[in-house]
């Protein structure tokens, strides 16, 4: 069975699609369009990596659904260990800033 025939891979693709939609919803159309093209031709790895980078760079608040799906994708396969670690560190730092009063939280999607 090829990797792309497994439910785990389908969830990885869904995560990439969710990140692309998230970027588009926040006005980052160039990034979203580029990642969509990469997803269509090369699979979800680079779009997920780019999504994490954009979330961190633009200081965005990911949805709870995205956080949950990313955790599930990470638990099921090793494809995104580095990106998941960056994502979790970013979320922890945002939580620490929020608790210390340094950050006014934007509304979550």
Predicted feature locations:
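C-terminal-biased regions
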Residues: 1-109
């Amino acid at each position: 069975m090829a990797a792309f025939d497994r439910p785990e891979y389908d969830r990885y693709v869904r995560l990439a699609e969710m990140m692309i939609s998230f970027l588009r919803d926040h006005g980052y159309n160039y990034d979203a369009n580029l990642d969509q093209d990469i997803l269509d031709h090369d699979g979800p790895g680079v779009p997920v990596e780019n999504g994490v980078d954009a979330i961190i760079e633009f200081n965005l608040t990911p949805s709870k659904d995205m956080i949950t799906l990313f955790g599930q994708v990470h638990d099921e396969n090793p494809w995104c260990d580095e990106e998941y670690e960056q994502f979790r560190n970013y979320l922890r730092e945002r939580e620490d800033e929020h608790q210390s009063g340094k950050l006014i939280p934007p509304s979550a999607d």
